[in-house]
């Protein structure tokens, strides 16, 4: 007799990570349920989704969101809760409120604090002797206005999908930002100032079992899309990067998914780490390369001790067609560019030659044609609205600074 599949609840359904996790889980024979503040979220349109539960946005109302999730877990007899975005941080803060029998893989809140904030991450990397660009944390206008080479990057303490990141190329841009930061009291939480370096952006994704690395994947951004995201990805293999990720996860005794961005310095080849995402990130390139991050996370969540997965195949080129359309529309706001991009994606020509679709896999999950059609129609009607799609999605799943303060209050009152 085949054992029953666990009942899985994903923490949101609007992000690209959620959409891809749904595909990977579905192809493995699972059916999932979603929590979403958006009734027509991207994840809804899948043959692998059984139900979408309405809940407040975790960023706008973390208390209401948590209450809704706990009610869903109880009434739907959920076995596993998979945090596919920043809700992992929320659940870590609310750990004592989660049912004892619920399967969920979470590191301690103290470990999250070391990677959730960009300033804390920089301190962690320095302590572990992990390469990073020349970095400093500034907490005053005077420090920010000090002399330093241009260009450089400024990063807010918290941000997702490349929000809260500014590239400063000269004194005029620096002074404009300085005025804004003083007005918004941004120096109170510390701002990360980081030197710009030349090189390819690569991302590494991992799953840990109480500090033991069990799955790791790396890919290179071949083509950048809206908000600094990816349109094209190329899988790569790097033993030194895997060793660095393993060292960080071991030091934090990490449990669950953990991802990093780094720049491979063009001059030295050194991987300089620049950002962390304490969660599962877009797992389809890994899956198509032979690394099952989502499956590993599910096993760990169920309390199993999975074997260590080998590196995947290098050279697997994947595309996010939906992001390619938004990218084409945002550049010059022209319908002809959108139509040309549709043709290139459909025929796998131009920059899409040799790629496999990872975000909207029409052949395996035909339901995704509905949101894809909506986006295409809207972009052909008004190409200048491309940015709104990403902004709406990010607002549905990201944590605001106010929400983060609320989560910390939960911790302090526990």
Language-model regions, residue ranges each:
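Active-site nucleotide/adenylate-binding loops and adjacent lid/helix of ATP-dependent enzymes
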Residues: 112-192, 198-199, 210-212, 238-243, ...
